[in-house]
């Protein structure tokens, strides 16, 4: 059986850059196929409608809906429209979602969710953020989410839904993930060296804190001379988080203890810990 996995990418968060790639890292899985429909950078109604129309036409077994602030009207409307068409949805979004009144409704709903607390909003002030700064920030953030283990936990949660479809479940019978990616959850089981573990955990805590600094710089501070250094400091925080992650991974390399968990062609997840060995 080939499982059809849809990815509806609405706007951008770092997790959305990697969503489908985490499921098929070498593009050789034979048990699944993915289709991504994107609204581009914006969340306008016409952009959302285009994504929903294309996704319904493809007819996935389930759909991953990735967006910032998952309780905004656009992302909320998209998943509700897909659900009405009989397509189960897993929401991947940032921690801003949990600060809104609608969070309780999402938790109690039929939708799955993965809240990436470390996937913090960018410092979106024109005086600071140009295309290169944007790309640099996302590169640092992707490294933090990768090395801490947050992306692995996200990938496994989605793989488990694929496994259920392969086992014959569908629609409302699917057990969808309901996961809040805290620092403890992200780093769990990822490191053998306790100092590497501590560095990675510190990195994720810093990455989470970046959101609050950028909220202050983007929405709570007037005057470019005041808000520009605030958002710049948030980006420096993310860079330091990335450097901590690099240090943690190098420590694991030094003792030949980097954990690798690739997919086989049939989607089975295997694992290895020493570099010169076969995954089992």
Curated annotation (Swiss-Prot):
Keywords assigned by UniProt, alphabetized: Methanogenesis, One-carbon metabolism, Oxidoreductase
Pfam families xrefs: MTD (PF01993)
Reactions catalysed, as given in the entry: 5,10-methylenetetrahydromethanopterin + oxidized coenzyme F420-(gamma-L-Glu)(n) + 2 H(+) = 5,10-methenyl-5,6,7,8-tetrahydromethanopterin + reduced coenzyme F420-(gamma-L-Glu)(n)
Gene Ontology molecular functions: ferredoxin hydrogenase activity; methylenetetrahydromethanopterin dehydrogenase activity
Top-level taxon of origin: Archaea
Pathway: One-carbon metabolism; methanogenesis from CO(2); 5,10-methylene-5,6,7,8-tetrahydromethanopterin from 5,10-methenyl-5,6,7,8-tetrahydromethanopterin (coenzyme F420 route): step 1/1
A single GO BP: one-carbon metabolic process
Presence of keyword Oxidoreductase: yes
Enzyme Commission code(s) on record: 1.5.98.1
Similarity comment: family membership: Belongs to the MTD family.
Role, per record: Catalyzes the reversible reduction of methenyl-H(4)MPT(+) to methylene-H(4)MPT.
Protein name, as recorded: F420-dependent methylenetetrahydromethanopterin dehydrogenase
Taxonomic source organism: Methanospirillum hungatei JF-1 (strain ATCC 27890 / DSM 864 / NBRC 100397 / JF-1)
Gene: mtd
